[in-house]
Amino acid sequence: MLIINDEEARALSGEYSIAKAARKILKMGPRFLVIKKGEHGALLFSGNEIFFAPALPMEDVFDPTGAGDVFAGGFMGYLAKTKNLSFTNMKRAIIYGSAMASFCVEKFGPQRLLEIQQRQIQKRVGEFVDLVKFRIK
């Protein structure tokens, strides 16, 4: 598992195209590759499979600092909780990571993350499901 941003993927692979970069990086060894694209979402690659999850459009963004790290923490936290490393579950983890990152940008610093409750996380995940019109089983 490797989680990097799009600029890191380009630098590591020497490719400008994210698809070509991902193919090269996967040949280096990771089974799964997540490429974060900031406010534009994230991509998951594994073998010949690709999944894209957009970021939730946020009207009030106060501080994007740390959102990528919060995404990675939410992603890995979901995987640790579910103990399932299938591609399907990785897609769910992308959505949970994106949901957590969306909370991060709502206030300056980590304050918002200290306030959220599980029901709010589930509601935000539901907003992602509605946004992309797919179901998480």
Outline where the language-model segments fall.
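Conserved phosphate-binding/catalytic region of the ribokinase-like
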Residues: 14-137
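A short beta-strand/loop micro-motif in the catalytic core of glycosyltransferases
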Residues: 1-5
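A generic structural signal for short hydrophobic patches within well-formed alpha-helices
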Residues: 9-10
